[in-house]
Amino acid sequence: MAADESSQNTLRLQFKAMQEMQHKRLQKQMEKKREKELSLKSRADDQEEPLEVSDGLSLLHAGEPNSKNSFEKRVLEDEIEHLRNELRETVDENGRLYKLLKERDFEIKHLKKKIEEDRFAFTGTAGVAGDVVATKIVELSKKNRLLMAESEGAKTRVKQLTNRIQELERELQTALTRLSAKGATDAGAKPPRAQMGDRALLETPEVKALQDRLVATNLKMSDLRNQIQSVKQELRMAQKVLAREVGEDINVQQLLSSPGTWRGRAQQILVLQSKVQELEKQLGQARSQSAGTASDELSVYPDPRKLSAQEKNLLRIRSLEREKQEGLEKLASERDVLQRELEELKKKFEGMRSRNKLLSSEMKTLKSQMGTLVEKGRHDDELIDALMDQLKQLQEILGSLSLQEEKTRVSQHHLDQQLNSEAQRSNSLVAQLQAMVAEREAKVRQLEMEIGQLNVHYLRNKGVGEGSSGREVSPAYTQFLEDPGLTKSPASAGDHVGRLGSSRSVTSLGHTLVESALTRPSLPSPHRTSPRFSDSPEQKGWQAQVSEIKALWQAAEVERDRLTEFVTVLQKRVEESNSKLLESERKLQEERHRTVVLEQHLEKIRLEPGKASASQRAAPRTKTGLPTSNNRHNPTGSEKKDPSFAQLSDVPVESQMEELTTRLAIQVEENEMLKAALGSALRGKEEDFRMYHEILGQVKSVFLQALRQQKTGKQ
């Protein structure tokens, strides 16, 4: 604003100086007018004296045309001076307009430099914020282009005004030449003085300054000629076509500016032929009239030698009067033409004045617009600084979020690898267990076959008298089978199922720990914009982008929290599964050891059949103690207590067989329980994978909903 005020003050001072120069010029012109009038009067007096001496009649006839000529010359001089004044005013206005245009060009260049600096400053930004900054810069560049277009329009108008000034100067020069020619016909000594005055006017410093300006404008026009060569070629082609129709050496602008309708070559030829015929008729009439007058004069004055001096003077006076009348008629026609031209020039000057007023008003509006643009640019700079700070903060937040996402991805990758490895291990364990179960089933079948063979052998060795003992053994055998102590294997299975249920409760906890993104409380925005910038549309756009980034951040946090919870659940499951696998491996080792012991004991029984009968007799005595031992037997107790070789050797064969059958049944049940546990573990892992996919789907849905809300808010 200070620069605008200083420029306005300088323009005012320059305008005052120009006005003073114009006043001085007017004073000089008035003095020159007075000198010219005095010189004209003195010349008229000098011419009147010999005429009075010659004859009184000649004074009367000669005074009238001199007064008419002087009046016409004064009128023409006044009009010329008026035109010169108008030219000076237009030149001054053009000078002011040039200065204003230069100032606007300087301001536009300054704004362009600022915009380029802002562009270089914003090239480092990326993402959505960079796109918004780029759109802002594009809008500012569009505004600058509009201003440049307006300034170019003003420049073209000024150039048109300068061209018009040149045309007016040419017309003035032609008018001066006409006046000099007329003055030469009327008075011999007058033209040199007028030409000297015109030369003095042309040699003034203001005229030189105008000529320098004209030279500068011509140089500028020469720079633009290179750009107009293509247009000139097209114009040449059009001019060739017009020359075929209109004729050569004809200005197209005159044809366009002519008020009448345009006529072709054939029509012009017809019109010119009619005009030639009319002029020939007029010439014939004029010749006949001149011949008639000459014959009358000859008839009245047959011989000029016989005429007296007075008659000769009268004839001479009449001829002079005729010549003067013809000259006056010509001058009157020329005066009418000049008056018409002056009226046209006045109209054009009025149009130029109105146009200059419009240009001045437009320049004022441009000044106001430039002031508003400067203020807006300052506000935009402040806004851009604030937005840049927010962008930096958001970039830092995004960087931290990206690091967290990378960490979560790495952890997920490790988890996937662990899960895959665990699945492979579990599959391998299942295959091993299946193979072991098949082996055990084969061994059980072999043992059953051997037991059947032993029973048959035992029954053959026994006699009929030993049937009572057999009857006593059979209820013991049935009692041993129906003993409730042997039904503790389902309890162990129930314990195992309880453990599996606890592991499944962990999976249920895994489900409950995950919260939906819609029920999650929205986090407060860490960086809020200042309220003074909340009304602008640019700030609304930035707020929309910030809200989008917040939505991304919230979704990432939800996903991170849920993944951490899922990781903790999976770690717990892995620990539990590892503990279970260790327990199952330990149990398998114990069962293998037991099977080896049983196989050894069976081989001893085969080798010692006599000892078996003795031990069978002692079976009723140990009948009450056996159920207690069987009641105490369970999968967990077998892990803590193993029967010694001495105890197994003391037990009779039938009880040993019953105990072996019960143990085999227990082992089969345990194998089935292990199979069920492995199947439940696999199902739990499948559910965990499904839950993980559901988590990802929920996070995606939350993110899409946030994006849709942002889009609807923008619209």
Swiss-Prot record:
It comes from the Eukaryota. Residues 625-637 have a biased composition (Polar residues). Keywords: Cell projection, Cilium biogenesis/degradation, Coiled coil, Cytoplasm, Cytoskeleton, Phosphoprotein. InterPro entries: CCDC13. GO terms for cellular component: cell projection; centriolar satellite; centrosome; cytoplasm. Residues 16-105, 134-458, 554-608, 653-683 form a coiled coil. Its main location: cytoplasm. Interacts with PCM1, CEP290 and PCNT. Required for primary cilia formation and promotes the localization of the ciliopathy protein BBS4 to both centriolar satellites and cilia. PANTHER family: COILED-COIL DOMAIN-CONTAINING PROTEIN 13. This is Coiled-coil domain-containing protein 13. It comes from Homo sapiens (Human). The gene is CCDC13.
